[in-house]
Amino acid sequence: MGTRSLTGENTMSNKTPFMYAISLGLALTPICFSTVSAQERCKVSEESSAAKSSYTQQHVMDVGDIPGHQIRVFELHRTYPNDKPNCQNLKRTETWEHGYSDYVDRNGRAWGYSVISLENGDKIFAQFDGTSQTTVAPDGSKKSTFTGVTRYIGGTGKYQSVQGLFKTNVVFDPDKNMNQAQNEGEYWLPASTVGQSQK
């Protein structure tokens, strides 16, 4: 390009800085988006204690095709008296879960919906889906575990457009009204809601 400018091609010479500016801008754009995206993501590792979780409703129906095949509809309530603040400095107060299970001897698929309430009144809506497995010990006692995925799909207030993805592990026993959950993952908010003051 230096040789051309010396031969009198001023038009090309004048365009050169402009073209460099465009190229530099295009090169930096993905870096800027990546930085903003990383700032908006919140890592989560949380536990829901069995002592503060209880099945408030359960309806079980025998399918009748093979022994032990049952369809169940359930409602689960969780409270969080000693919860840790999230990335917006808000604590959970309670969660209501409404779900379904399709089990044979407590093995099979379970899925449903959650509504998580925060201390400022905002709510987060979630879906969960996964598989339960039950092992029977020599003494006849059972241990049931659920492994699946929980997704944040929206909410209210600053969480209206929240999205999230979590690995969920649950140890449960519906007969003993016991349910203890562990979630690992992250959620993110649109840039327009980050930094908003609490309601």
Language model segments and positions:
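Bacterial N-terminal signal peptides that target proteins for export
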Residues: S13-I22
